């Protein structure tokens, strides 16, 4: 018998909490769980006791690495929350949680406003069309400035963000917030851990400013809502309900971003933020339809949430749990799913059996018999499913829009101590790569060396740490190296002909391929332009495969060749001696032959770097950037500090943290994000080729 759903769809919210590192995101999530009755004791991140940060490394480092999913209840609504990491190395975690969310809270530090990683996740959220509300946190902190934070939203994100609250006081005088829609003040009782507050009239000394800000808010809402605009121009009264409904609609349409204020650490403003989640962020019924494809005829399908439709969901994370093994986190878009039933992994075209279904609270779990449209849950028992796979009803296959994962930019070598460690290492690498699509492991067939690559030094540190702790691998870890790429800069055509006669059956494959540089980021594209069957149909996939395999090893120094188009336009075959492997080898020969005329170049990752330091160190920092082949893109003052924005090659950034620390007596900090690939200077290219014993 079917179970009844506990919360209707319009009372469901799937939200993420995203921010720059140290903006107080995990603390905000903790407080939400505390006030919604999920936790009985508040855990502080800086004491290493936080509920959401459940991996050992997270508690030691005080940062969030994996997106823990948890379910809370607020005023008759179910709120599924995904806590995402703020550190740039873990952008993938943010990216994949955004894919399955309907809305998000962006947390800002009231002193710093919008920071580099905030810009990153904001851009990602815009790409996925995720509506957001903003929480200006740490209003109790020295230097907290609500208006400055508001300015950075406009200047750095070009966001149409408007305050629906204003803070009462700041720094150690921060007492609560004024609700600009209700025109009431919520003032907190200092002793009650934020569980009690008084709702009173706006204090007299704030009335003028609050009235002015409310008028600005109404005007901003009128700009994005015609009905409100008409009333505004006619001078008619706009009710609170109309104002809220208009803000909700504009937020869902990504035209408006409501801003809240508070201090999660001091337990102020979190309940009003939760009201904001319910009031302004969409339920699964409010968001645009989800795009899907029918794999049988490639037709486009639009999915609207509802329990009465066939089951369709998306796996967005794989985690290994010490007690139950492999967990697949997934979002249900349509239909329902019962534990014990069979589903189709439509991406891989494989049937899977759902063992048990769990709803997660951080890393505690409740077993549930059934999940409904709009739910986020974890399944045990899915053997073939990886991140980004579509899970559907067996008779209604659909492929949901998947996720795009950036390529890793940094790598280290791993050398196991013993044969036994080699086996453990292989298992560890397989499991870790299943969990994290931006973590890659490959063994060089010629040297036998294993290289692991990821999004940054911290990312790889944590992966190595997990290999040691969870899989007990003993291994030597090399120095970090840059994940270079290779590409062609000119058009070139070449023949690849492989003929072998040595008694018995011979080998024969012959192809002509034209190579052209492709647009940056477009990857490898293959075109079959064979006319008249000079290369038989059945061998064409082998030609493409042969090109792909030899591109993986590059043509100059062994780095993958990217952004190249290959057009197979001529060739010949032998009735008896031709086979798939001969054409595969012929294709790789064509690539090698073309490389000589195609202007092959080595590309290096260029990072967008932001350095923040007191003004007196500005000269030193500019000098350091230039010495590292960097280009300064701009500078701005923030308080008494200077911010330098620059583009610097990743290879020059190793060890920069130490250099910056000693140059600024520990007062400077920096963040970096991968931006693009660019050709390395000729002299450096020659060094790299020589070092790798390349061509």
Curated annotation (Swiss-Prot):
Record-linked Pfam families: EF-G_D2, EFG_C, EFG_III, EFG_IV, GTP_EFTU
PROSITE patterns reported in the protein's UniProt record: G_TR_1, G_TR_2
GO biological process: ribosome disassembly
One CC-aspect GO term: cytoplasm
A GO term for molecular function: GTPase activity
Keyword Protein biosynthesis: yes
Domain of life: Bacteria
Job description of the protein: Catalyzes the GTP-dependent ribosomal translocation step during translation elongation. During this step, the ribosome changes from the pre-translocational (PRE) to the post-translocational (POST) state as the newly formed A-site-bound peptidyl-tRNA and P-site-bound deacylated tRNA move to the P and E sites, respectively. Catalyzes the coordinated movement of the two tRNA molecules, the mRNA and conformational changes in the ribosome.
Protein name per its UniProtKB record: Elongation factor G
Organism, as annotated: Latilactobacillus sakei subsp. sakei (strain 23K)
Lineage of source species: Bacteria, Bacillati, Bacillota, Bacilli, Lactobacillales
């Amino acid at each position: 018998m079917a179970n009844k759903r506990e919360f209707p769809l319009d009372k469901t919210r799937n939200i993420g909490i995203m921010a720059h590192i140290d903006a107080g995101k995990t603390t905000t999530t903790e407080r939400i769980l505390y006030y919604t009755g999920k936790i009985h004791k508040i855990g502080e991140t800086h004491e290493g006791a936080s509920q959401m940060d459940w991996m050992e490394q997270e508690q030691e480092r005080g940062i969030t690495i994996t997106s823990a999913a948890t379910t809370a209840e607020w005023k008759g609504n179910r709120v599924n929350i995904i806590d995402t990491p703020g550190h740039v190395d873990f952008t993938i975690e943010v990216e994949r949680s955004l894919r399955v969310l309907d809305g998000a809270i962006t947390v800002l530090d009231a002193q710093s406003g919008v920071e580099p990683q905030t810009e990153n996740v904001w851009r990602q959220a815009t790409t996925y069309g995720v509506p957001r509300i903003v929480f200006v946190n740490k209003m109790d902190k020295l230097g907290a400035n609500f208006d400055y934070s508001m300015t950075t939203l406009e200047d750095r994100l070009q966001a149409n963000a408007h305050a629906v609250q204003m803070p009462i006081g700041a720094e150690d005088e921060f007492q609560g917030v004024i609700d600009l829609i209700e025109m009431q003040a919520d003032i907190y009782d200092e002793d009650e851990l934020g569980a009690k507050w008084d709702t009173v009239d706006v204090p007299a000394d704030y009335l003028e400013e609050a009235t002015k800000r409310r008028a600005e808010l109404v005007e901003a809402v009128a700009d994005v809502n015609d009905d409100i605009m008409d009333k505004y121009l006619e001078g008619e009264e706009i009710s609170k309900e109309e104002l809220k409904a208009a803000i909700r609609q504009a937020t869902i349409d990504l035209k408006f971003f409501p801003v809240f204020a508070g201090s999660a650490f001091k337990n102020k403003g979190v309940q009003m933020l939760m009201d904001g989640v319910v009031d302004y962020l969409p339920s699964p019924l409010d968001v645009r339809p989800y795009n899907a494809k029918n794999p049988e005829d490639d037709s486009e399908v639009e999915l609207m949430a509802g329990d009465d439709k066939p089951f369709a969901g998306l796996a967005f994370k794989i985690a290994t749990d010490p007690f139950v093994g492999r967990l697949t986190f997934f979002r249900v878009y349509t239909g329902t799913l019962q534990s014990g039933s069979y589903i189709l992994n439509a991406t891989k075209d494989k049937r899977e059996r759902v063992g048990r279904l769990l709803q997660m609270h951080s890393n505690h779990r409740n077993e549930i018999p059934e999940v409904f449209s709009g739910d986020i849950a974890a399944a045990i028992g899915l053997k073939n499913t990886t991140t980004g796979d579509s899970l559907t009803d067996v008779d209604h296959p659909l492929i949901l829009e998947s996720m795009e994962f950036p390529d890793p930019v940094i790598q280290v070598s791993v050398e196991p101590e013993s044969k036994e460690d080699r086996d453990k290492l292989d298992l560890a690498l397989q499991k870790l790569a299943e969990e994290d699509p931006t973590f890659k492991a490959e063994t060089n067939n010629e040297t036998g060396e294993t290289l692991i690559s990821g999004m940054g030094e911290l990312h790889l540190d944590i992966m190595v740490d997990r290999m040691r702790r969870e899989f007990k691998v003993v291994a030597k870890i090399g120095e970090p190296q840059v994940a270079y790429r290779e590409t062609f800069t000119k058009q070139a055509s070449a023949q690849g002909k492989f003929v072998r006669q040595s008694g018995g059956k011979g080998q024969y494959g012959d192809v002509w391929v034209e190579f052209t540089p492709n647009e940056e980021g477009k990857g490898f594209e293959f075109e079959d332009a064979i006319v008249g069957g000079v290369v038989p149909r059945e061998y064409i996939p082998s030609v493409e495969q042969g090109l792909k395999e030899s591109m993986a090893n590059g043509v100059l120094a062994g780095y993958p060749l990217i952004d190249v188009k290959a057009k197979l336009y001529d060739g010949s075959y032998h009735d008896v001696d031709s086979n798939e492997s001969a054409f595969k080898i012929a294709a790789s020969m064509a690539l090698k032959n073309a490389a000589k005329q195609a202007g092959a170049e080595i590309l290096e990752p260029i990072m967008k770097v932001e350095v923040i330091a007191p003004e007196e160190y500005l000269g030193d920092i500019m000098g350091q950037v230039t010495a590292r082949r960097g280009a300064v893109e701009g500078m701005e003052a923030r308080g008494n500090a200077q911010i330098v924005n620059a583009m610097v090659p990743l290879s020059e950034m190793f060890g920069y943290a130490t250099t910056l620390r000693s140059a600024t007596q520990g007062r400077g900090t920096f963040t970096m994000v991968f931006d693009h690939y660019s050709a390395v200077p000729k002299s450096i290219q020659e060094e790299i080729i020589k070092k790798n014993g390349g061509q």
